Amino acid sequence: MTMFENVTRALARQLNPRGDLTPLDSLIDFKRFHPFCLVLRKRKSTLFWGARYVRTDYTLLDVLEPGSSPSDPTDTGNFGFKNMLDTRVEGDVDVPKTVKVKGTAGLSQNSTLEVQTLSVAPKALETVQERKLAADHPFLKEMQDQGENLYVVMEVVETVQEVTLERAGKAEACFSLPFFAPLGLQGSINHKEAVTIPKGCVLAFRVRQLMVKGKDEWDIPHICNDNMQTFPPGEKSGEEKVILIQASDVGDVHEGFRTLKEEVQRETQQVEKLSRVGQSSLLSSLSKLLGKKKELQDLELALEGALDKGHEVTLEALPKDVLLSKEAVGAILYFVGALTELSEAQQKLLVKSMEKKILPVQLKLVESTMEQNFLLDKEGVFPLQPELLSSLGDEELTLTEALVGLSGLEVQRSGPQYMWDPDTLPRLCALYAGLSLLQQLTKAS
């Protein structure tokens, strides 16, 4: 996970714990997430590691007939996050331990991340709603044909001034052990990096779903659910496709770890329906991509494209006569989404863990810690059951510490015990899903 992602996720949690404020994943995309921008929700999104949205090149205003322009988004003022982050540098506030913020030109030595919110005022929305939808707009036609749902950015959290972020802290040096060198992990873990975030950069946002009514009427309701569709139901095949995509989405409320476990099990069952050859080939495909985040993301896009078109696909390592059903594609897409949430270093550690056949132990470790603390919203140190680690040799234990440590779960051999930080939950959920898939595939192989 990049430093930018770490900061935006911590910010979203700090300002809106367990809420609907979505952190931005990519710095280069921030201009496409301003108020009124249209975005797409990624296929097989899950609230456990964050509903993920994809930029488009259009705003709501682009797809409306000409008419009155809305007033500028309302500035609701600066947040107190600046002072909280200042305090955290001294060790007292709940933001990532691995990030500090350094002021740049125009900021004092002690300045940190200062943010403000901009939101679409109700009167501005009323003004825009006087304009009809451009029903023949090619973008709208394309989205309707693909059964996509469109969302409108209604509120953003953005930087007030330019800041430079530096990664620092003990996480840099924890895992720079000799046996990691062949994996290329030392450079990706034990290093410093900095990123400059410009003034006015969107860090997090809220969306509401666009609803099309008839040919040119539209609305942006305050309350939505996963069963709602942007476009009126059309032909049957399109309806089936949308149901498939939304079927595994989580509701707005987490009941705890059990809900995550049931969701992962549902998707795993679809993978289990593949033949042994199919599962072995899928494992081979994924093993070649782990540690190559860009290629893994390309696979995710290809799978999304397959769902868009509603046809069967095959992966490179699969025999040509082994086709994937839409249900299988959806399940694989779910797990690939989880794996892309992990850093390249973690992905390489997963490959090493498969070689050493310690995935079951790692899965049990992650499962046990989340089962105990899933709804806990405060940091704490807790005892770890010794039997969770007793079967691991020294090298295997260090590898496991690194794998979970990069998701923010700090395991300490003395005790043994572990440090729980609620900010780590989304990353641990993604790691749990990734471990579950790989364990199933290695077992079948």
UniProtKB/Swiss-Prot annotation:
Keywords: Cell membrane, Cytoplasm, Lipoprotein, Membrane, Necrosis, Palmitate, Transmembrane, Transmembrane beta strand
Record's signal peptide: none
GO cellular component: cytosol; membrane; perinuclear region of cytoplasm; plasma membrane
Example GO molecular function: phosphatidylinositol-4,5-bisphosphate binding
Outcome, altering L260D: Spontaneous pyroptosis-inducing activity
Pfam family, one: Gasdermin
Keyword Ligase: no
Site feature ((Microbial infection) Cleavage) residues: L244, I245, Q246
InterPro entries: Gasdermin, Gasdermin_pore, Gasdermin_PUB
Residues engaged in binding a cardiolipin: R9, A10, L11, A12, R13
The record's account of how the chain is modified after translation: Cleavage by S.pyogenes SpeB relieves autoinhibition by releasing the N-terminal moiety (Gasdermin-A, N-terminal) that initiates pyroptosis. Palmitoylated.
Transmembrane regions listed in the UniProt entry: 78-95, 99-120, 163-179, 183-197
Substitution effect: Y334D: Spontaneous pyroptosis-inducing activity
Organ and tissue specificity: Expressed predominantly in the gastrointestinal tract and, at a lower level, in the skin. Also detected in mammary gland. In the gastrointestinal tract, mainly expressed in differentiated cells, including the differentiated cell layer of esophagus and mucus-secreting pit cells of the gastric epithelium. Down-regulated in gastric cancer cells.
GO biological process: defense response to bacterium; programmed cell death; pyroptotic inflammatory response
Chain positions covered by the region annotation Triggers pyroptosis: 1-251
Family: Belongs to the gasdermin family.
Domain notes: Intramolecular interactions between N- and C-terminal domains are important for autoinhibition in the absence of activation signal. The intrinsic pyroptosis-inducing activity is carried by the N-terminal domain.
Protein name in UniProt: Gasdermin-A
Gene from which the chain derives: GSDMA
